[in-house]
Amino acid sequence: FGNIYDGERYDANLEIENWCAPSCTYANWQPVKRNTTTNLGAISARLSLPVKAKHIITPKQITTPKNELVFDLGQNITGWFTFMADLPAGVELRVQTGELLQDDCFYRDNLRTALSEYRYISTGKKAFIRPIATFYGFRYIKFSGVADLTGITDIQAWALYSDLEQTGEITTANEKVNRLYLNSVWSQRDNFLDVPTDCPQRDERMGWTGDAHVFAPTASFTM
């Protein structure tokens, strides 16, 4: 299961070994049929820029009053996370994302109905984990379903956005002003995931043209 709001659920026990190899002997494969009745028109190249992984961040584990297993990226991004998992068979790992802390604890109520999570059921074999059918808007990552992080290593976060070239930059003698400007740059990056969106994290994530119309003149000064 996977969608942009609720995230992804992956049961590794259902994997088909070598499913994309010519040598795969999976008995339930069915022959395809050529569609000669539907007129799909000519294939053309995409008009928008490709979405790429533009930054890779190594998060730091933080201590919360609730003793949660939380990592901090130090920057709010749109994208996904990756890690290595070497867990006992049958363990269901839950990974949740959030944008901020409340009372120094993990917080996600601002996401409203969006679950924004990743669930992984282990086969007992070491595996590389990366969501493939969703994306998240987040700064914090919370692990649950395990007592500690034994078997979970190499945690990284990938910032994804359209392959735009940054054309403008502002640097001042005031670090707070610099941070304010950088926040606006990251907000633009986070919401330029193919089409300009209103937000990358909660249960909306729509390409409203009204939002883009208002922001377009400002955006053109940066990218």
What is each residue range found by the language model?
Residues V214-M223:
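Well-ordered alpha-helical scaffold segments within catalytic/enzyme domains
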Residues F1-R202, G210-D211:
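Extracellular/oxidizing-compartment recognition motifs
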